[in-house]
Amino acid sequence: MILRRRLIKLLFATLPAYQVLGVSSVFGNSNVTDEDHILAVLINTLRSLNNHVCEKAADKLEKRVHSFNSYTLHLRYGMLDSLDAKKISEALKSVHQNHNIRLTSFSVSYNPTLGQDGAKSILSSLPKNIGELGMVGCNLSDVTGSYFIEFIRKSKNLNMICIEENNFSQKMKDKILNLRQQKTSCTIIV
């Protein structure tokens, strides 16, 4: 079993993402699921960032309990910048494109170098059925606030969004908080 996991890990690390999706035919159907293949792109991307927080998240994704085709991804205090965010965004798009897997909770809180472009990239890549989102303390301004408004409006299952400790004006905070009237089941913390 351990050898099989190591072989799969090696295969994921050496093959391009589009080739990884066929691994179950090589190893049989025992413990390798389609869900593992889908997340391989994201796991490899996180590892490629050479960052302790991302490495830990990749390990967690590899070892997670398979339940209801869902996962969480928390990258708090990862010193992620806009380039890292773009790579993560592309991997998220790949994971959620034509696949039935749910990202229940996502956080890049306390990444002050994320930037407006990084936040925009991530927001555009998150699935509409996400349950929780955190971008606390990311040094974001009103420009990003408008992206959050659009994201909250389009989200279908969002029940919590935490975006406090950023640089939003009071006017922008009020605009975001006014969305509670439309999204009554969503807790919005700005």
Which residues does each predicted region cover?
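Leucine-rich tandem repeat or coiled-coil scaffolds
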Residues: 8-190
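Secretory targeting signals
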Residues: 1-3
